[in-house]
Each structure stands twice: as C-alpha cells, then as structure tokens.
C-alpha cells in the first residue's frame, strides 16, 4: 500500500474540531425557533399520555391497518428528516449523525440535524424541525424526562419518532402513543461478554488479576450502562480470581474517562488490566494512566469499534473492542422510518425494541488464540471481523467533512425498492466480509430467554435495580449479591 493510501490516525484535537464544525453547520441549517401546536410542558403525567396510546399492532392485519392509518407522506415525496443528538464529542455520535445524513440524502429526504443539551432544547429543536417539514425524527440518547412530551408533540403533528439508547424498564416505544415506533440499541451485555472473556483470558495466562473496571453513566443511556455491567458479571463468573477495582463512571466520553482514570489513580496504581464501558471513555482513562506511568494498553478491552481504538488495536496498544457497525447501525433507521411515513411498513409491538448484531475486532492471530482457549469461540454471538479492512473501508471516512460510507440505505427500504426496482438487502449493500454479524439486527423480544416484549421490560427494569451501580470487588461478593436477583433478570449468555 502506498504511503498516501495508508490510514491516517485521527487525533483528539481533530475529532473535536470536526464536532465543532458539524455543530456549527447543523445549527445554521436546521434550527428555526418556531413552535408548532402549543404544548404545556408542565402538564401532569396523565395529561401527557396521548389519546392514541392504545394503537399497537400485534398481527399482520393490524400492521397493515396502522401503516395506512398513520402514514404522513406519499412514496417518493421529499420531506424533512430530523436527527437530534446529545453531543458530537464522541466518534460514535459523529458517525451516527453522518450515516443518518447519508441515508436521508440517499432516500431523497431533506436532512436536518442538531445538538440538544437541555430538556427545553430537545423540545424546542423537535418543534422547530417539525415546523420546517420534518415528518420523522430520530433521537440519539434522549433524556427520559422529555420522552412523554416529545411523543405528545409527534402524536399531535403526525410525526414518526425513533431513538438510540432511549428506553428503560419504565419507558418503551409504544408507551406514549403509536408514533414513537422504534428504539435501536445493542444488547450491550452481548457486546461486553465476548471481549471481556478475551481480556480476562489474556490476564489469566499472564498471571494478572487486578482489573480496573470503569462503568458508563447513571444518567445517560442507562439502558446500556446496565446491560454492560450485566456482561461484566457474565464474564467474571468464568474468571473468579479477578479483582475488579475502581468502578468509576466515564460518562461515555474522552474527558469523562480521563477524570475517571485520574480518580482511580488517586486510590492505587497497580492495575494490571482495564475494562472500559466504551472506546471513547476508555481512551480518555488510558491517557491518564499513561501520564502516570501505568502502561496496561495491551491488556485493555472495551466496546464500540471506533477509529482511534481500532488503530491502537493494530499497533498492539489495545487488545480488543466489540463493534456494532456504527454507520450501518445509525443509517438503517432512516429507511425504516421512511417506510412508515409512506405506509409501507409498521412495526408489531414486539418489533419496537431492536438491537444490532456484534463483531469483535482485535489483532489477527492473538484474538483467535484467546477465543479458543477461553471457549468463547463456541458462543454463537461471538464473531471476529477484520480490523485493518474496517479501518480502510469504513472507519477512515469518519474524518471526512461529508463521508460516504459503503452502504446504499435505499436497499433497506421496502418502498424505495418498489419505487426504483431495487432488490431489498438487509445488509444495505455492505455485505458480511467487514462485519460478519453486525450488518444485521434482531428483535430482543424474540430471543429464547425472553419470548415477549414484557419479559424484556421486566429484565431491563431489574437490571436498573441491580446493575446501574456495580461496584463489587471480588467474585465471592458478586455471588452473594446475585442471590437477590429475581427470575426476570436473565444471566444466561445466550442471545439466540
């Protein structure tokens, strides 16, 4: 490969520069401070529940009926699509934004994007986008406090709504009417268990037991926080000699991760391995450890498969990360919403919670050996994707002003395929070479261990009770703690 063709490492400064440019651009292009139908944001919980809350589809006949009843556009119509995110200071958030813009433009829609940091900004931004013609909105990590009101706004204006990391045991799509239709969130226990098994196996082989454990957040995307901590519990059961230490929250980002790392260094410095809740906060914590002379990079694992982490993996400075093909994960929601807008599809009740499949990325050779010796290779959820090829063909585009990821999201739209004579492709043209499993998704309610959406709800509710703060140091203590778990809290390492 020529020198000019080699992937260039993106610096933290470049990432934040991109985020700032993106934020400035979207602010200028999308926010018009106009309100649609007036909404009383101080209404009681009872008042906030839309009149259409009972509209759900449980059969194919009801699916077709609701698709036609709720449609708000005609096939081929050019309407607005709005994306609101809680920040753009993380590679995941930027790639999610970029891929939704790409998908919207491929489908011939007017893309609008914005950052919202307060409850009022979430509400006002949604209203502004609807006033500008948005017929579908997507929210990345919305605060749960605004969901009843946002659903009411969308219900009153016949606008479809989807989310990433937008549910808890108390709040699900469909709870506030028929227009919050989908939440797309990986089951992060499935994304934690395999890479952590690999890390603990490597630590065992090297006589290491002191594992620095960083959690995610008690306030943002808590559904992922609790899933991740469940995955930690699942892996730990196979390596009871490990001591989990630190337990700080990295708040999903580089700066939060660095603060968490500094807090742990104030307690001790003899850490021998590191599990972080996602790549961004883990990289931040590693920077603090390195500055303090604690170099445990090759004994580090996390989840997301962001560019800078993947580059460190190939350099031997990071063991493994588990990815959900972020650009595919982000972009695929757009054609699904388009199909709902034009009446081509509507989810059944148990299809409203969705999750992406997952792949692990590490150094070729090492990750396979660890998978064999740990036994994780026998788990159907375990899959290995090519790290170098992902960098060169997908992740490197993250640095571009307006990237074109290797997907044609029209192929995921039932309506667009019919309109244009295309063949439907669940992988959106991305194939399975770069992402053997993660160019795909599934419905958690249909997993064997759940079997219904209500079982998923009870599971997530129990996880929020027992795993929002998992600050246990020894496996003996964890075993004792687990005696409290109710039967609805599923600890089986089976996602089939």
PLM regions and their residue ranges:
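Short, solvent-exposed amphipathic alpha-helices that sit
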Residues: 92-106, 191-195, 223-242, 256, ...
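Hydrophobic alpha-helical
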Residues: 123, 137-156, 231-232, 246-312, ...
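Short beta-strand elements in bilobed, periplasmic/extracellular small-molecule ligand-binding domains
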Residues: 105-116, 212-213, 238-254
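Hinge/cleft segment of the Venus flytrap/periplasmic-binding protein
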Residues: 44-78, 216, 332, 336-496
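Flexible loop/hinge segments that line or gate small-molecule binding clefts
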Residues: 147-190, 306-312
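N-terminal secretory signal peptides
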Residues: 1-14, 24, 28-29, 35-42
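Hydrophobic alpha-helical segments within soluble ligand-binding/sensing domains
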Residues: 181-211, 257-258, 305-309, 325-344
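Extracytoplasmic "Venus flytrap"
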Residues: 50-71, 78-99, 112-124, 132, ...
């Amino acid at each position: 490969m020529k020198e000019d063709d080699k992937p260039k490492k993106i610096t933290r400064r470049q990432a934040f520069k991109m985020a700032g440019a993106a934020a400035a651009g979207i602010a200028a292009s999308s926010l018009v401070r106009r309100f649609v139908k007036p909404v009383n944001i101080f209404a009681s919980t009872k008042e906030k529940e839309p009149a259409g809350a009972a509209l759900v589809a449980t059969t194919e006949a009801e699916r077709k009926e609701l698709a036609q009843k709720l449609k708000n556009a005609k096939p081929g119509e050019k309407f607005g699509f709005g994306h609101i995110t809680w920040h753009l200071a993380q590679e995941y958030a930027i790639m999610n934004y970029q891929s939704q813009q790409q998908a919207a433009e491929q489908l011939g829609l007017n893309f609008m994007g914005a950052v919202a940091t307060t409850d009022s900004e979430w509400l006002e931004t949604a209203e502004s986008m609807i006033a500008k013609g948005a017929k579908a909105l997507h929210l990345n990590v919305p605060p749960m406090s605004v969901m009843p009101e946002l659903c009411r706004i969308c219900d009153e204006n016949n606008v479809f709504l989807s989310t990433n990391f937008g549910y808890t045991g108390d709040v699900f799509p469909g709870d506030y009417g028929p227009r919050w239709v989908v939440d797309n969130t990986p089951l992060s226990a499935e994304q934690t268990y395999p890479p952590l098994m690999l890390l603990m196996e490597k630590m065992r082989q090297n006589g290491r037991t002191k594992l620095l454990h960083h959690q995610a957040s008690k306030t943002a995307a808590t559904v992922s926080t609790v899933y991740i901590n469940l995955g930690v519990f699942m892996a730990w059961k196979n390596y009871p000699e490990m001591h989990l230490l630190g337990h700080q929250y990295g708040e999903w980002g580089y700066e939060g991760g660095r603060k968490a790392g500094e807090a742990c260094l104030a307690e001790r410095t003899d850490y021998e391995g590191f599990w972080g809740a996602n790549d961004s906060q883990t990289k931040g914590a590693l920077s603090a450890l390195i500055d303090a002379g604690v170099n445990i990079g090759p004994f580090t694992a996390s989840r997301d498969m962001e560019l800078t982490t993947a580059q460190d993996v190939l350099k031997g400075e990071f063991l493994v990360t588990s990815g959900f093909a972020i650009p595919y994960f982000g972009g695929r929601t757009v054609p699904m919403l388009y199909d709902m807008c034009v009446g081509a599809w509507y989810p059944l009740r148990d299809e409203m919670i969705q999750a992406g499949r997952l792949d692990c990325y590490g150094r070729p050779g090492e990750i396979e050996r660890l998978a064999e010796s740990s036994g994780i290779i026998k788990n159907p959820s375990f899959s290995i994707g090519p790290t170098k090829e992902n960098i060169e063909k997908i992740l490197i585009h993250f640095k571009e002003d307006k990237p074109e990821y290797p997907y044609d999201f029209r192929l995921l739209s039932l309506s667009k395929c019919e309109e244009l004579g295309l063949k439907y492709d669940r992988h959106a043209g991305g194939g399975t070479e770069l992402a053997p499993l993660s160019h795909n998704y599934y419905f958690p309610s249909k997993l064997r261990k759940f079997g219904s959406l209500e079982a998923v709800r009870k599971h997530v509710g129990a996880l929020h009770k027992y795993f929002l703060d998992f600050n246990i140091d020894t496996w003996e203590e964890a075993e004792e703690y687990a005696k409290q778990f109710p039967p609805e809290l599923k600890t089986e390492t089976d996602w089939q």
